Amino acid sequence: MIAALFSVSVVVAALGYFVDIYDLILFSIVRVQSLKAIGLDGQELLDKGVLLLNMQMAGMLLGGIIWGILGDRKGRVKILFGSIFLYSLANTANGFVNSIGAYALCRFIAGIGLAGELGAGVTLVIEELPREFRGYGTMVVATVGVTGAILANFVAKHFDWRVAYFIGGGLGLLLLFLRIRIYESRMFLSVEEQGISRGNFISLFTNKKRFFKYLHSILIGLPIWYCVGILITFSPEFARALSVRGPVSAGEAVMSCYFGLVFGDFGSGYLSQQLKSRKKVVLAFLLLATLIVALYFRLNNVTSSIFYFCCFAMGFAVGYWAIFVTIAAEQFGTNLRATVASTAPNFIRGTVVPITFFFKIATNYFGILTGGAIVGMVCITIAFYSLYRLEETFHKDLNYIEE
């Protein structure tokens, strides 16, 4: 088992996702510092910051589709390294920007590149490892990957923002040297030889059963991005509404949450192997997330340390990201697997936009605490229902195609 878990495929996928998360988190951390350095101030820091985030998200949504289709048509390995190469170049270029236009272009290109990494890596790992070890493989990928956020925080604190981007680009380019030792998935090669139609993204929407399977695979991840995108991102505002004693910064809340995610991804992956079930583990983590979210809204007049610990616990509770992507990939045949594995995580990331939209509406009507709780209740309820509708995939033989 040890040899399988530390095969070149698993190591490259894990390190690729590590650099992927580093870049995703780095922008959030250096946003203000970098925008001030190119001459922005005041309200522009927020307005242009939102623009850059939207450009990155647009790139990720587009990239998820592009890389997914290419992953099923051209191969998992080509896409894995193609995505690493693209976001590494974008990161390096980002260190040279001096205008908001150039910054936005770099974030858009980086978003496209970042979109392909996780899906291609997970697809390659679950197709290469024996079925009894698949969960362990994705556990390693996610656990190592999430620690990229910790490195991003460290680098941003000790280096200039331009240097931080150069480091991210350099780390990605270093990974390309491992390409010579990684081989394509045998399942993909078998399907390729048969000349079967592959990567037909539209086919996910033309068959009712397949569409709802795809939709439910995505929606079980809603609580993850509700917690990260709302409760953690807007933690200073929630802390003020809860009369938390002591200063609360979004940066520290994010780091606390991601530290919890490291343990959550490891724990959920390990439990899924011990229980021999994906659904039971996601159910357990959803129940825990419901409890932690309810507790979050009851943190009246606590110290900032207790608040940060709750952020850590929340990160652990929604740390089923690896299982989420694994379930999505295992639901579909070899000719659509990379398409699903690449689009599902990026589409669920994209739900931050409608979640934030409804959060703002609910806040206007009910206040930040009640409004936030209502949105959370809806997201978690949808996730429970979607999980119920999905089939268990732990013992599933993945060597098949979608007709």
What is the predicted function of each stretch?
Residues L62-N98:
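Conserved MFS/SLC helix-loop-helix module at the cytosolic interface between two early adjacent transmembrane helices
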Residues R73-S83, E132, Q273-L286:
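Cytoplasmic membrane-interface "Motif A"-like loop-to-helix N-cap segments
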Residues G75, F96-A102, P130, K276, ...:
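Helix-breaking motifs and short loop linkers at transmembrane-helix boundaries and internal kinks
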Residues C106-T143:
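Cytoplasmic helix-loop-helix junction between adjacent transmembrane helices
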Residues V141-I180:
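Helix-loop-helix hairpin linking two adjacent transmembrane segments in secondary transporters
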